[in-house]
Amino acid sequence: MNVYESLQTVLLFVVLLAMVKPLGTFMARVFQGERTILSPVLAPAESLLYGVCGVNSEEEMDWKRYARAMVLFNLVIFATLFAMLMLQHLLPLNPQKFPAFSWQLALNTAVSFTTNTNWQAYAGEQAASYFTQMVGLTVHNFVSAATGIAVAIAVIRGFARRTTSALGNFWVDLTRATLYILVPISLIAALVLVSQGVIQNFSAYQAVSLVQPVTYDTPKRDGTGSPVKDPTGNPVTERVTAKEVTIPMGPVASQEAIKELGTNGGGFFNANSAHPFENPTPLSNMLEILLILLIPFSLTYTFGAMVGNTRQGWTLLGVMLLILLASFAVLQGVESGGNPLVTKLGVHGANMEGKDTRFGLAGSSLFTVATTGTSCGAVNTMHDSLTPIGGMIPMSLMLLGELVPGGVGSGLYTMLAFAVIAVFVSGLMIGRTPEYLGKKIEVREMWMSVVTVLAAGVMVLILSGIAMISPSAVAAMANPGAHGLSEVLYAFASMANNNGSAFAGLSANTTFYNILGALAMIVGRFAPAVAVLAMAGSLAEKKYVPPSLGTLPTDKVPFALWLTLVILIVGALTFFPALSLGPIVEHLTMTM
Protein backbone atom coordinates (compact mmCIF):
# COMPACT_ATOMS: atom_id res chain seq x y z
CA MET A 1 0.00 0.00 0.00
CA ASN A 2 1.12 3.55 -0.62
CA VAL A 3 1.16 6.18 2.11
CA TYR A 4 -2.30 7.51 1.21
CA GLU A 5 -3.91 4.07 1.34
CA SER A 6 -2.15 3.24 4.61
CA LEU A 7 -3.30 6.47 6.24
CA GLN A 8 -6.92 6.09 5.18
CA THR A 9 -6.97 2.47 6.41
CA VAL A 10 -5.49 3.40 9.79
CA LEU A 11 -7.84 6.38 10.10
CA LEU A 12 -10.86 4.20 9.36
CA PHE A 13 -10.05 1.74 12.14
CA VAL A 14 -9.15 4.50 14.59
CA VAL A 15 -12.55 6.13 14.02
CA LEU A 16 -14.30 2.75 14.16
CA LEU A 17 -12.70 1.68 17.44
CA ALA A 18 -13.30 5.12 18.94
CA MET A 19 -17.03 4.70 18.25
CA VAL A 20 -17.32 1.19 19.72
CA LYS A 21 -17.61 2.21 23.37
CA PRO A 22 -20.03 5.15 22.95
CA LEU A 23 -22.37 3.26 20.64
CA GLY A 24 -22.02 0.02 22.61
CA THR A 25 -22.88 1.83 25.84
CA PHE A 26 -25.82 3.56 24.16
CA MET A 27 -27.21 0.25 22.89
CA ALA A 28 -26.85 -1.34 26.33
CA ARG A 29 -28.84 1.53 27.87
CA VAL A 30 -31.50 1.28 25.17
CA PHE A 31 -32.09 -2.44 25.65
CA GLN A 32 -31.98 -2.22 29.44
CA GLY A 33 -34.79 0.32 29.26
CA GLU A 34 -32.71 3.21 30.59
CA ARG A 35 -33.16 6.82 29.58
CA THR A 36 -30.98 8.02 26.68
CA ILE A 37 -30.42 11.26 24.83
CA LEU A 38 -33.08 10.25 22.29
CA SER A 39 -35.73 9.30 24.86
CA PRO A 40 -37.50 12.71 24.96
CA VAL A 41 -38.11 12.48 21.22
CA LEU A 42 -38.60 8.75 20.65
CA ALA A 43 -40.14 7.45 23.90
CA PRO A 44 -43.62 8.85 23.03
CA ALA A 45 -43.44 7.25 19.58
CA GLU A 46 -42.33 3.98 21.16
CA SER A 47 -45.24 4.02 23.62
CA LEU A 48 -47.67 4.86 20.82
CA LEU A 49 -46.47 1.88 18.78
CA TYR A 50 -46.94 -0.47 21.73
CA GLY A 51 -50.45 0.88 22.28
CA VAL A 52 -51.48 0.56 18.64
CA CYS A 53 -50.05 -2.97 18.35
CA GLY A 54 -51.33 -4.15 21.73
CA VAL A 55 -47.87 -4.93 23.10
CA ASN A 56 -47.33 -5.07 26.86
CA SER A 57 -43.81 -3.70 27.11
CA GLU A 58 -43.46 -4.92 30.71
CA GLU A 59 -44.16 -8.56 29.82
CA GLU A 60 -41.17 -10.81 29.17
CA MET A 61 -40.89 -14.05 27.19
CA ASP A 62 -39.09 -17.33 27.67
CA TRP A 63 -36.93 -18.54 24.81
CA LYS A 64 -39.74 -20.50 23.14
CA ARG A 65 -42.13 -17.54 23.04
CA TYR A 66 -39.32 -15.26 21.93
CA ALA A 67 -38.42 -17.63 19.08
CA ARG A 68 -42.07 -18.06 18.06
CA ALA A 69 -42.58 -14.30 17.94
CA MET A 70 -39.41 -13.88 15.88
CA VAL A 71 -40.39 -16.58 13.38
CA LEU A 72 -44.00 -15.34 13.14
CA PHE A 73 -42.89 -11.76 12.48
CA ASN A 74 -40.51 -12.87 9.76
CA LEU A 75 -43.20 -15.04 8.18
CA VAL A 76 -45.53 -12.04 7.98
CA ILE A 77 -42.95 -9.68 6.48
CA PHE A 78 -41.94 -12.41 3.99
CA ALA A 79 -45.54 -12.81 2.82
CA THR A 80 -45.93 -9.04 2.52
CA LEU A 81 -42.85 -8.64 0.35
CA PHE A 82 -43.70 -11.69 -1.76
CA ALA A 83 -47.14 -10.23 -2.52
CA MET A 84 -45.60 -6.85 -3.31
CA LEU A 85 -43.19 -8.38 -5.84
CA MET A 86 -45.93 -10.43 -7.49
CA LEU A 87 -48.16 -7.34 -7.78
CA GLN A 88 -45.44 -4.84 -8.67
CA HIS A 89 -47.02 -3.95 -12.02
CA LEU A 90 -50.19 -2.80 -10.23
CA LEU A 91 -48.49 -0.67 -7.58
CA PRO A 92 -47.57 3.05 -7.80
CA LEU A 93 -44.15 4.68 -8.28
CA ASN A 94 -43.26 2.53 -11.27
CA PRO A 95 -42.28 5.05 -13.97
CA GLN A 96 -40.44 2.42 -16.01
CA LYS A 97 -43.51 0.12 -16.05
CA PHE A 98 -41.58 -2.88 -14.73
CA PRO A 99 -43.60 -6.13 -14.78
CA ALA A 100 -44.19 -8.38 -11.79
CA PHE A 101 -41.48 -10.80 -10.68
CA SER A 102 -41.86 -14.48 -11.59
CA TRP A 103 -42.98 -16.55 -8.60
CA GLN A 104 -39.57 -18.25 -8.28
CA LEU A 105 -37.71 -14.95 -8.32
CA ALA A 106 -40.26 -13.35 -5.97
CA LEU A 107 -39.86 -16.27 -3.56
CA ASN A 108 -36.08 -16.04 -3.62
CA THR A 109 -36.06 -12.26 -3.27
CA ALA A 110 -38.62 -12.16 -0.46
CA VAL A 111 -36.72 -14.82 1.49
CA SER A 112 -33.47 -13.02 0.75
CA PHE A 113 -34.52 -9.65 2.18
CA THR A 114 -36.41 -11.22 5.09
CA THR A 115 -33.33 -13.16 6.20
CA ASN A 116 -30.96 -10.16 5.89
CA THR A 117 -29.20 -11.93 3.00
CA ASN A 118 -30.11 -9.57 0.15
CA TRP A 119 -29.04 -12.09 -2.49
CA GLN A 120 -30.20 -10.57 -5.77
CA ALA A 121 -30.88 -12.76 -8.77
CA TYR A 122 -32.07 -9.67 -10.64
CA ALA A 123 -30.65 -6.27 -11.60
CA GLY A 124 -32.30 -3.65 -9.40
CA GLU A 125 -32.47 -0.86 -11.97
CA GLN A 126 -33.91 -3.26 -14.58
CA ALA A 127 -36.52 -5.09 -12.48
CA ALA A 128 -37.59 -3.26 -9.30
CA SER A 129 -39.84 -0.19 -9.19
CA TYR A 130 -39.29 2.72 -6.82
CA PHE A 131 -42.19 1.48 -4.68
CA THR A 132 -40.63 -1.98 -4.43
CA GLN A 133 -37.22 -0.53 -3.60
CA MET A 134 -38.54 1.86 -0.92
CA VAL A 135 -41.56 0.24 0.70
CA GLY A 136 -40.51 -3.34 0.12
CA LEU A 137 -36.75 -3.76 0.14
CA THR A 138 -35.65 -0.77 2.25
CA VAL A 139 -38.22 -1.46 4.97
CA HIS A 140 -37.05 -5.07 5.09
CA ASN A 141 -33.48 -3.84 5.45
CA PHE A 142 -34.54 -2.17 8.71
CA VAL A 143 -36.65 -4.96 10.19
CA SER A 144 -34.33 -7.84 9.23
CA ALA A 145 -31.41 -6.02 10.83
CA ALA A 146 -33.52 -5.26 13.91
CA THR A 147 -34.43 -8.95 14.15
CA GLY A 148 -30.77 -9.94 14.30
CA ILE A 149 -30.03 -7.33 16.96
CA ALA A 150 -33.03 -8.45 19.02
CA VAL A 151 -31.90 -12.09 19.01
CA ALA A 152 -28.37 -11.06 20.02
CA ILE A 153 -29.72 -9.01 22.94
CA ALA A 154 -31.83 -11.95 24.11
CA VAL A 155 -28.73 -14.16 24.02
CA ILE A 156 -26.77 -11.60 26.04
CA ARG A 157 -29.53 -11.65 28.67
CA GLY A 158 -29.19 -15.43 28.80
CA PHE A 159 -25.58 -15.02 29.91
CA ALA A 160 -26.29 -12.06 32.20
CA ARG A 161 -29.38 -13.31 34.07
CA ARG A 162 -29.62 -16.01 36.74
CA THR A 163 -32.31 -18.54 37.67
CA THR A 164 -34.96 -17.12 35.34
CA SER A 165 -36.59 -18.19 32.10
CA ALA A 166 -37.17 -14.62 30.87
CA LEU A 167 -35.10 -13.33 27.94
CA GLY A 168 -36.96 -10.09 27.29
CA ASN A 169 -39.74 -9.18 24.87
CA PHE A 170 -39.10 -9.64 21.15
CA TRP A 171 -41.51 -6.87 20.13
CA VAL A 172 -39.88 -4.38 22.48
CA ASP A 173 -36.36 -5.30 21.36
CA LEU A 174 -37.39 -5.10 17.70
CA THR A 175 -38.96 -1.68 18.18
CA ARG A 176 -36.04 -0.25 20.14
CA ALA A 177 -33.45 -1.56 17.69
CA THR A 178 -35.28 0.17 14.86
CA LEU A 179 -36.27 3.44 16.55
CA TYR A 180 -33.21 4.20 18.64
CA ILE A 181 -30.37 2.70 16.60
CA LEU A 182 -31.07 1.99 12.94
CA VAL A 183 -33.27 4.94 11.98
CA PRO A 184 -31.20 7.78 13.55
CA ILE A 185 -27.84 6.55 12.25
CA SER A 186 -29.30 5.82 8.79
CA LEU A 187 -30.79 9.31 8.59
CA ILE A 188 -27.44 10.96 9.32
CA ALA A 189 -25.56 8.60 6.99
CA ALA A 190 -28.02 9.20 4.13
CA LEU A 191 -27.51 12.96 4.37
CA VAL A 192 -23.73 12.54 4.27
CA LEU A 193 -24.02 10.23 1.26
CA VAL A 194 -26.16 12.78 -0.57
CA SER A 195 -23.46 15.38 0.08
CA GLN A 196 -20.99 13.07 -1.68
CA GLY A 197 -23.18 12.66 -4.76
CA VAL A 198 -25.43 9.68 -4.03
CA ILE A 199 -28.73 10.42 -5.78
CA GLN A 200 -32.15 10.70 -4.11
CA ASN A 201 -35.04 11.45 -6.46
CA PHE A 202 -38.18 10.05 -8.09
CA SER A 203 -37.36 11.06 -11.66
CA ALA A 204 -37.91 8.76 -14.61
CA TYR A 205 -34.83 7.19 -16.17
CA GLN A 206 -32.90 9.50 -18.52
CA ALA A 207 -32.14 8.37 -22.10
CA VAL A 208 -28.99 10.01 -23.48
CA SER A 209 -27.67 9.64 -27.04
CA LEU A 210 -24.03 8.64 -27.36
CA VAL A 211 -21.69 10.89 -29.32
CA GLN A 212 -20.29 7.78 -30.96
CA PRO A 213 -21.93 4.30 -31.08
CA VAL A 214 -20.23 1.65 -28.96
CA THR A 215 -19.92 -1.97 -30.10
CA TYR A 216 -19.19 -4.69 -27.56
CA ASP A 217 -19.55 -8.43 -26.98
CA THR A 218 -22.01 -9.78 -24.42
CA PRO A 219 -22.71 -13.37 -23.30
CA LYS A 220 -25.51 -15.00 -25.28
CA ARG A 221 -28.31 -16.49 -23.16
CA ASP A 222 -31.06 -18.99 -23.88
CA GLY A 223 -34.74 -18.64 -23.02
CA THR A 224 -34.16 -19.56 -19.37
CA GLY A 225 -31.46 -16.94 -18.89
CA SER A 226 -28.61 -19.46 -18.77
CA PRO A 227 -25.45 -18.76 -20.80
CA VAL A 228 -25.14 -20.52 -24.16
CA LYS A 229 -21.93 -22.55 -24.44
CA ASP A 230 -19.95 -23.99 -27.34
CA PRO A 231 -18.99 -27.71 -27.53
CA THR A 232 -15.87 -27.07 -25.40
CA GLY A 233 -17.91 -25.57 -22.56
CA ASN A 234 -16.91 -21.95 -23.11
CA PRO A 235 -19.58 -19.20 -23.22
CA VAL A 236 -20.85 -17.98 -26.60
CA THR A 237 -20.93 -14.21 -27.08
CA GLU A 238 -22.85 -11.96 -29.45
CA ARG A 239 -21.94 -8.49 -30.72
CA VAL A 240 -24.17 -5.57 -29.72
CA THR A 241 -24.04 -1.92 -30.85
CA ALA A 242 -25.37 0.73 -28.47
CA LYS A 243 -26.40 4.16 -29.81
CA GLU A 244 -27.86 5.55 -26.59
CA VAL A 245 -27.54 4.89 -22.89
CA THR A 246 -30.24 4.91 -20.23
CA ILE A 247 -29.24 6.53 -16.95
CA PRO A 248 -31.28 5.14 -14.04
CA MET A 249 -32.61 7.41 -11.30
CA GLY A 250 -34.25 6.75 -7.96
CA PRO A 251 -34.28 7.18 -4.15
CA VAL A 252 -30.85 5.64 -3.65
CA ALA A 253 -29.32 7.38 -0.61
CA SER A 254 -32.12 6.38 1.77
CA GLN A 255 -31.64 2.72 0.82
CA GLU A 256 -27.84 2.89 0.68
CA ALA A 257 -27.46 3.99 4.30
CA ILE A 258 -29.44 1.15 5.87
CA LYS A 259 -28.07 -1.27 3.27
CA GLU A 260 -24.63 -0.83 4.82
CA LEU A 261 -25.56 -0.10 8.45
CA GLY A 262 -27.84 -3.13 8.70
CA THR A 263 -25.28 -5.35 6.92
CA ASN A 264 -27.97 -6.06 4.33
CA GLY A 265 -26.04 -5.43 1.12
CA GLY A 266 -28.66 -5.46 -1.61
CA GLY A 267 -27.89 -2.73 -4.11
CA PHE A 268 -30.29 -0.31 -5.76
CA PHE A 269 -28.22 -0.93 -8.90
CA ASN A 270 -26.82 -4.16 -10.28
CA ALA A 271 -23.25 -2.90 -9.84
CA ASN A 272 -24.03 -2.28 -6.15
CA SER A 273 -21.50 -0.04 -4.39
CA ALA A 274 -19.28 0.04 -7.48
CA HIS A 275 -21.95 2.24 -9.10
CA PRO A 276 -21.11 5.96 -8.88
CA PHE A 277 -24.71 6.76 -7.89
CA GLU A 278 -24.33 4.50 -4.83
CA ASN A 279 -20.70 5.12 -3.90
CA PRO A 280 -19.25 8.10 -5.79
CA THR A 281 -16.09 9.09 -3.88
CA PRO A 282 -13.29 7.65 -1.74
CA LEU A 283 -14.89 9.38 1.26
CA SER A 284 -18.25 7.73 0.63
CA ASN A 285 -16.39 4.42 0.27
CA MET A 286 -14.76 4.82 3.69
CA LEU A 287 -18.09 5.87 5.21
CA GLU A 288 -19.81 2.78 3.82
CA ILE A 289 -17.09 0.50 5.22
CA LEU A 290 -17.48 2.25 8.58
CA LEU A 291 -21.25 1.72 8.50
CA ILE A 292 -20.82 -1.97 7.67
CA LEU A 293 -18.53 -2.62 10.65
CA LEU A 294 -19.99 -0.19 13.18
CA ILE A 295 -22.85 -2.09 14.84
CA PRO A 296 -21.28 -5.59 14.77
CA PHE A 297 -18.14 -4.31 16.52
CA SER A 298 -20.09 -2.10 18.94
CA LEU A 299 -22.35 -4.97 20.01
CA THR A 300 -19.31 -6.64 21.59
CA TYR A 301 -19.08 -3.72 24.02
CA THR A 302 -22.84 -3.93 24.58
CA PHE A 303 -22.30 -7.57 25.51
CA GLY A 304 -19.56 -6.71 27.98
CA ALA A 305 -21.60 -3.91 29.53
CA MET A 306 -24.71 -6.06 29.98
CA VAL A 307 -22.85 -9.02 31.53
CA GLY A 308 -20.97 -6.69 33.86
CA ASN A 309 -17.46 -7.23 32.48
CA THR A 310 -16.48 -5.08 29.52
CA ARG A 311 -13.20 -6.99 29.11
CA GLN A 312 -15.27 -9.94 27.88
CA GLY A 313 -16.54 -7.77 25.05
CA TRP A 314 -13.10 -6.41 24.20
CA THR A 315 -11.80 -9.99 24.03
CA LEU A 316 -14.40 -10.96 21.43
CA LEU A 317 -13.72 -7.76 19.50
CA GLY A 318 -10.00 -8.57 19.51
CA VAL A 319 -10.64 -11.99 17.97
CA MET A 320 -12.86 -10.47 15.29
CA LEU A 321 -10.34 -7.75 14.52
CA LEU A 322 -7.41 -10.17 14.37
CA ILE A 323 -9.01 -12.44 11.77
CA LEU A 324 -10.40 -9.50 9.78
CA LEU A 325 -7.06 -7.67 9.57
CA ALA A 326 -5.21 -10.89 8.71
CA SER A 327 -7.69 -11.50 5.88
CA PHE A 328 -7.23 -7.94 4.64
CA ALA A 329 -3.44 -8.33 4.65
CA VAL A 330 -3.59 -11.58 2.64
CA LEU A 331 -6.10 -10.20 0.13
CA GLN A 332 -4.15 -6.98 -0.31
CA GLY A 333 -0.94 -8.97 -0.79
CA VAL A 334 -2.19 -11.44 -3.39
CA GLU A 335 -4.08 -8.79 -5.38
CA SER A 336 -1.10 -6.42 -5.42
CA GLY A 337 0.98 -9.31 -6.79
CA GLY A 338 -1.15 -9.38 -9.92
CA ASN A 339 -2.75 -12.11 -12.01
CA PRO A 340 -0.25 -15.00 -12.46
CA LEU A 341 -1.30 -15.55 -16.09
CA VAL A 342 -0.75 -11.89 -16.95
CA THR A 343 2.54 -11.80 -15.05
CA LYS A 344 3.82 -14.69 -17.20
CA LEU A 345 3.33 -12.46 -20.23
CA GLY A 346 5.71 -9.92 -18.76
CA VAL A 347 3.00 -7.49 -17.63
CA HIS A 348 3.59 -6.66 -13.99
CA GLY A 349 1.37 -4.78 -11.58
CA ALA A 350 -1.61 -5.23 -9.31
CA ASN A 351 -4.70 -7.16 -10.37
CA MET A 352 -7.04 -4.24 -11.04
CA GLU A 353 -9.60 -6.18 -13.07
CA GLY A 354 -13.05 -5.65 -11.55
CA LYS A 355 -11.84 -2.82 -9.31
CA ASP A 356 -12.53 0.90 -9.52
CA THR A 357 -9.55 3.23 -9.68
CA ARG A 358 -11.35 5.85 -7.58
CA PHE A 359 -11.18 3.47 -4.61
CA GLY A 360 -7.77 1.97 -5.33
CA LEU A 361 -6.57 -1.49 -4.39
CA ALA A 362 -6.66 -0.92 -0.62
CA GLY A 363 -10.13 0.65 -0.68
CA SER A 364 -11.39 -2.28 -2.74
CA SER A 365 -9.71 -4.95 -0.61
CA LEU A 366 -10.87 -3.41 2.66
CA PHE A 367 -14.45 -3.18 1.40
CA THR A 368 -14.27 -6.81 0.28
CA VAL A 369 -13.20 -8.22 3.66
CA ALA A 370 -15.61 -5.91 5.51
CA THR A 371 -18.60 -6.97 3.44
CA THR A 372 -17.85 -10.71 3.66
CA GLY A 373 -16.58 -10.66 7.24
CA THR A 374 -20.02 -9.28 8.06
CA SER A 375 -23.25 -10.53 6.50
CA CYS A 376 -23.45 -7.42 4.31
CA GLY A 377 -22.65 -8.65 0.83
CA ALA A 378 -22.48 -5.19 -0.77
CA VAL A 379 -19.58 -4.96 -3.21
CA ASN A 380 -17.44 -2.23 -4.74
CA THR A 381 -15.28 -4.87 -6.42
CA MET A 382 -16.28 -7.76 -8.66
CA HIS A 383 -15.32 -10.75 -6.53
CA ASP A 384 -15.37 -13.05 -9.56
CA SER A 385 -12.42 -11.05 -10.95
CA LEU A 386 -10.21 -11.59 -7.90
CA THR A 387 -7.26 -13.95 -8.19
CA PRO A 388 -8.03 -17.51 -7.02
CA ILE A 389 -6.49 -17.01 -3.57
CA GLY A 390 -7.92 -13.50 -3.46
CA GLY A 391 -11.39 -14.91 -4.14
CA MET A 392 -10.86 -17.59 -1.49
CA ILE A 393 -10.47 -14.91 1.22
CA PRO A 394 -14.03 -13.51 1.07
CA MET A 395 -15.35 -17.03 0.51
CA SER A 396 -13.53 -18.27 3.62
CA LEU A 397 -14.77 -15.36 5.72
CA MET A 398 -18.32 -16.41 4.88
CA LEU A 399 -17.63 -20.09 5.43
CA LEU A 400 -16.25 -19.39 8.92
CA GLY A 401 -19.81 -18.44 9.83
CA GLU A 402 -20.01 -14.67 9.30
CA LEU A 403 -18.53 -13.81 12.70
CA VAL A 404 -15.57 -11.48 12.09
CA PRO A 405 -17.44 -9.38 13.05
CA GLY A 406 -20.50 -10.91 11.39
CA GLY A 407 -23.90 -9.43 10.71
CA VAL A 408 -25.74 -7.07 13.03
CA GLY A 409 -26.62 -9.36 15.92
CA SER A 410 -25.94 -12.63 14.13
CA GLY A 411 -22.20 -12.11 14.23
CA LEU A 412 -22.17 -11.70 18.00
CA TYR A 413 -24.37 -14.69 18.79
CA THR A 414 -22.39 -16.91 16.42
CA MET A 415 -19.16 -15.77 18.09
CA LEU A 416 -20.68 -16.56 21.50
CA ALA A 417 -21.55 -20.05 20.26
CA PHE A 418 -17.91 -20.51 19.25
CA ALA A 419 -16.85 -19.19 22.67
CA VAL A 420 -19.00 -21.86 24.34
CA ILE A 421 -17.37 -24.54 22.16
CA ALA A 422 -13.90 -23.20 22.95
CA VAL A 423 -14.62 -23.22 26.69
CA PHE A 424 -16.06 -26.74 26.49
CA VAL A 425 -13.04 -28.12 24.61
CA SER A 426 -10.63 -26.46 27.03
CA GLY A 427 -12.58 -27.94 29.94
CA LEU A 428 -12.21 -31.41 28.46
CA MET A 429 -8.47 -30.87 28.07
CA ILE A 430 -7.94 -30.03 31.76
CA GLY A 431 -10.59 -32.34 33.18
CA ARG A 432 -12.92 -29.70 34.64
CA THR A 433 -16.54 -28.80 34.08
CA PRO A 434 -16.39 -25.92 31.60
CA GLU A 435 -17.76 -22.53 32.67
CA TYR A 436 -18.36 -19.31 30.77
CA LEU A 437 -19.31 -16.10 32.55
CA GLY A 438 -20.17 -18.03 35.69
CA LYS A 439 -22.48 -20.49 33.92
CA LYS A 440 -21.71 -24.20 33.61
CA ILE A 441 -21.57 -25.38 30.02
CA GLU A 442 -23.30 -28.74 29.74
CA VAL A 443 -24.67 -31.04 27.05
CA ARG A 444 -27.67 -28.89 26.07
CA GLU A 445 -25.55 -25.77 25.56
CA MET A 446 -23.03 -27.72 23.51
CA TRP A 447 -25.67 -29.21 21.23
CA MET A 448 -27.23 -25.82 20.60
CA SER A 449 -23.89 -24.13 19.95
CA VAL A 450 -22.92 -26.88 17.49
CA VAL A 451 -26.20 -26.40 15.59
CA THR A 452 -25.56 -22.64 15.54
CA VAL A 453 -22.07 -23.08 14.14
CA LEU A 454 -22.63 -25.91 11.66
CA ALA A 455 -26.17 -25.43 10.28
CA ALA A 456 -25.12 -23.09 7.48
CA GLY A 457 -21.99 -25.09 6.64
CA VAL A 458 -23.93 -28.32 6.24
CA MET A 459 -26.33 -26.59 3.85
CA VAL A 460 -23.42 -25.19 1.81
CA LEU A 461 -21.80 -28.58 1.27
CA ILE A 462 -25.01 -30.51 0.60
CA LEU A 463 -26.49 -27.99 -1.84
CA SER A 464 -23.18 -27.43 -3.64
CA GLY A 465 -22.91 -31.20 -4.12
CA ILE A 466 -26.45 -31.36 -5.51
CA ALA A 467 -25.66 -28.49 -7.88
CA MET A 468 -22.62 -30.31 -9.26
CA ILE A 469 -24.76 -33.27 -10.36
CA SER A 470 -27.73 -31.24 -11.59
CA PRO A 471 -27.64 -30.45 -15.35
CA SER A 472 -29.63 -27.22 -14.95
CA ALA A 473 -27.32 -25.99 -12.19
CA VAL A 474 -24.19 -26.81 -14.18
CA ALA A 475 -25.63 -25.10 -17.27
CA ALA A 476 -25.89 -21.85 -15.28
CA MET A 477 -22.11 -21.78 -14.75
CA ALA A 478 -20.37 -19.42 -17.17
CA ASN A 479 -16.96 -20.93 -16.43
CA PRO A 480 -15.91 -24.59 -16.53
CA GLY A 481 -13.52 -26.40 -14.21
CA ALA A 482 -12.30 -25.28 -10.81
CA HIS A 483 -13.55 -21.72 -11.18
CA GLY A 484 -17.04 -22.96 -11.99
CA LEU A 485 -17.01 -24.99 -8.77
CA SER A 486 -15.82 -21.88 -6.92
CA GLU A 487 -18.78 -19.93 -8.30
CA VAL A 488 -21.27 -22.51 -7.03
CA LEU A 489 -19.54 -22.93 -3.67
CA TYR A 490 -19.41 -19.15 -3.25
CA ALA A 491 -23.11 -18.82 -4.13
CA PHE A 492 -24.31 -21.29 -1.51
CA ALA A 493 -21.78 -20.01 1.05
CA SER A 494 -23.21 -16.55 0.48
CA MET A 495 -26.85 -17.59 0.68
CA ALA A 496 -26.57 -20.02 3.61
CA ASN A 497 -24.54 -17.51 5.63
CA ASN A 498 -26.93 -14.66 4.74
CA ASN A 499 -24.29 -12.61 2.95
CA GLY A 500 -25.66 -12.01 -0.53
CA SER A 501 -22.51 -11.26 -2.54
CA ALA A 502 -21.71 -13.43 -5.55
CA PHE A 503 -19.21 -14.58 -8.12
CA ALA A 504 -21.05 -12.95 -10.99
CA GLY A 505 -20.22 -15.65 -13.54
CA LEU A 506 -23.10 -17.74 -12.18
CA SER A 507 -26.53 -17.15 -13.74
CA ALA A 508 -28.55 -17.23 -10.52
CA ASN A 509 -32.03 -16.44 -11.87
CA THR A 510 -32.96 -20.05 -12.59
CA THR A 511 -35.54 -22.28 -10.94
CA PHE A 512 -32.81 -24.41 -9.35
CA TYR A 513 -30.89 -21.59 -7.69
CA ASN A 514 -33.99 -19.57 -6.80
CA ILE A 515 -35.65 -22.43 -4.90
CA LEU A 516 -32.63 -24.16 -3.35
CA GLY A 517 -31.12 -20.76 -2.62
CA ALA A 518 -34.26 -19.80 -0.70
CA LEU A 519 -33.98 -23.03 1.29
CA ALA A 520 -30.34 -22.29 2.11
CA MET A 521 -31.20 -18.77 3.29
CA ILE A 522 -34.06 -19.94 5.50
CA VAL A 523 -32.04 -22.66 7.21
CA GLY A 524 -28.95 -20.47 7.48
CA ARG A 525 -30.92 -17.71 9.20
CA PHE A 526 -33.42 -19.43 11.46
CA ALA A 527 -31.73 -22.68 12.51
CA PRO A 528 -28.85 -20.82 14.24
CA ALA A 529 -31.17 -18.13 15.63
CA VAL A 530 -33.57 -20.61 17.24
CA ALA A 531 -30.71 -22.81 18.46
CA VAL A 532 -28.87 -19.92 20.09
CA LEU A 533 -32.10 -18.73 21.74
CA ALA A 534 -32.54 -22.23 23.17
CA MET A 535 -28.98 -22.06 24.50
CA ALA A 536 -29.68 -18.65 26.02
CA GLY A 537 -32.85 -19.93 27.68
CA SER A 538 -30.93 -22.79 29.26
CA LEU A 539 -28.15 -20.49 30.47
CA ALA A 540 -30.58 -17.97 31.97
CA GLU A 541 -32.04 -20.69 34.21
CA LYS A 542 -28.65 -21.63 35.66
CA LYS A 543 -27.19 -20.37 38.92
CA TYR A 544 -24.07 -18.25 38.97
CA VAL A 545 -20.91 -20.21 39.78
CA PRO A 546 -18.13 -18.04 41.28
CA PRO A 547 -14.75 -18.43 39.54
CA SER A 548 -12.21 -20.71 41.21
CA LEU A 549 -8.52 -21.48 40.72
CA GLY A 550 -9.37 -23.92 37.94
CA THR A 551 -11.68 -21.56 36.02
CA LEU A 552 -10.42 -20.58 32.59
CA PRO A 553 -10.17 -16.75 32.37
CA THR A 554 -12.15 -15.78 29.27
CA ASP A 555 -11.19 -12.11 29.26
CA LYS A 556 -7.47 -12.58 28.69
CA VAL A 557 -5.22 -12.84 25.62
CA PRO A 558 -4.64 -16.65 25.91
CA PHE A 559 -8.38 -17.32 25.62
CA ALA A 560 -8.64 -14.91 22.68
CA LEU A 561 -5.91 -16.84 20.86
CA TRP A 562 -7.53 -20.16 21.78
CA LEU A 563 -10.90 -18.97 20.48
CA THR A 564 -9.26 -17.83 17.25
CA LEU A 565 -7.65 -21.24 16.84
CA VAL A 566 -10.95 -23.06 17.45
CA ILE A 567 -12.71 -20.93 14.82
CA LEU A 568 -10.01 -21.60 12.23
CA ILE A 569 -9.83 -25.34 13.00
CA VAL A 570 -13.60 -25.81 12.68
CA GLY A 571 -13.58 -23.88 9.40
CA ALA A 572 -10.61 -25.81 8.03
CA LEU A 573 -12.00 -29.24 8.94
CA THR A 574 -15.36 -28.40 7.40
CA PHE A 575 -14.41 -26.69 4.16
CA PHE A 576 -10.78 -27.37 3.26
CA PRO A 577 -11.63 -30.32 0.93
CA ALA A 578 -14.13 -28.18 -0.99
CA LEU A 579 -11.74 -25.24 -1.18
CA SER A 580 -9.01 -27.58 -2.41
CA LEU A 581 -11.13 -28.52 -5.43
CA GLY A 582 -12.02 -24.91 -6.20
CA PRO A 583 -9.77 -21.87 -5.64
CA ILE A 584 -6.69 -23.81 -4.52
CA VAL A 585 -6.65 -26.02 -7.63
CA GLU A 586 -7.31 -22.97 -9.80
CA HIS A 587 -4.37 -21.14 -8.23
CA LEU A 588 -2.04 -24.11 -8.76
CA THR A 589 -3.20 -24.41 -12.37
CA MET A 590 -2.47 -20.74 -13.05
CA THR A 591 0.97 -20.76 -11.44
CA MET A 592 2.31 -24.04 -12.87
UniProtKB/Swiss-Prot annotation:
Is-annotated flag, keyword Signal? Answer: no
Q: Which GO terms describe its cellular component?
A: plasma membrane
Record-annotated membrane-spanning stretches:
7-27, 71-91, 136-156, 179-199, 287-307, 314-334, 411-431, 449-469, 473-493, 515-535, 559-579
Q: How does it sit in the membrane?
A: Multi-pass membrane protein
Task: Report a single Gene Ontology molecular function.
Answer: P-type potassium transmembrane transporter activity
Keyword Cell division present in the record's keywords: the answer is no
Chief subcellular site?
Answer: membrane
- State where the protein is found: Cell inner membrane
Alphabetically sorted, this entry's keywords are: Cell inner membrane, Cell membrane, Ion transport, Membrane, Potassium, Potassium transport, Transmembrane, Transmembrane helix, Transport
Q: Which GO terms describe its biological process?
A: potassium ion transmembrane transport
Which Pfam families is this protein grouped with?
A: KdpA
Check the record and name the InterPro entries matching this protein.
Answer: KdpA
Q: What does this protein do?
A: Part of the high-affinity ATP-driven potassium transport (or Kdp) system, which catalyzes the hydrolysis of ATP coupled with the electrogenic transport of potassium into the cytoplasm. This subunit binds the periplasmic potassium ions and delivers the ions to the membrane domain of KdpB through an intramembrane tunnel.
UniProt record similarity statement = Belongs to the KdpA family.
What subunit structure does UniProt give?
Answer: The system is composed of three essential subunits: KdpA, KdpB and KdpC.
- This one is known as Potassium-transporting ATPase potassium-binding subunit
Q: Which organism is it from?
A: Geobacter sulfurreducens (strain ATCC 51573 / DSM 12127 / PCA)
